[in-house]
C-alpha cells in the first residue's frame, strides 16, 4: 500500500508542477477571455489518459504513477469549474457555455485519439 501511495504522490507532484509550468508559459503569450491554460492541460491530460489506458492497462504500478498520479495532478476539474462559474457570475453566458461544452467535447475527442493511437503503437 505504501508503494502505491508513493507512486501516486510522485506522479501527482510531477503532474502538478507541469500544470504550473504550462500555465506560466501560456500566460506569457496569451491574454484572451478563455482560460487557455486550464483548457490546454485538461485536453492534454485527456489525450494522455487515452494513450496510457492502452499502453499501461496491464501494469498497475504504471497506471498509478501516470494515470492516477501524473494525469490527476496535471488536469484540473476544480479550476475548470471555478473559471466557468466566474464567467457565469460576470454575465459572460455565451463564453461560459462555449468553454464548458467545448472543453468536454474536445476532451472526449482527445481521449479517443489517445486510445486510438495506443492501439496503433501497441496492438
Region roles according to the model:
Residues 1-123:
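Membrane-interface helix-loop junctions in multi-pass transporters/channels
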Amino acid at each position: 500500500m505504501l508503494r502505491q501511495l508513493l507512486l501516486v504522490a510522485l506522479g501527482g507532484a510531477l503532474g502538478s508542477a507541469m500544470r504550473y509550468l504550462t500555465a506560466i508559459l501560456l500566460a506569457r503569450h496569451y491574454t484572451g477571455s478563455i482560460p487557455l491554460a486550464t483548457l490546454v492541460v485538461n485536453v492534454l491530460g485527456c489525450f494522455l489518459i487515452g494513450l496510457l489506458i492502452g499502453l499501461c492497462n496491464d501494469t498497475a504500478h504504471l497506471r498509478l504513477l501516470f494515470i492516477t498520479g501524473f494525469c490527476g495532478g496535471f488536469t484540473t476539474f476544480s479550476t475548470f469549474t471555478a473559471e466557468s462559474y466566474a464567467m457565469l457570475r460576470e454575465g459572460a453566458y455565451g463564453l461560459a457555455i462555449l468553454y464548458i461544452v467545448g472543453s468536454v467535447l474536445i476532451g472526449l475527442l482527445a481521449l479517443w485519439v489517445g486510445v486510438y493511437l495506443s492501439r496503433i503503437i501497441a496492438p
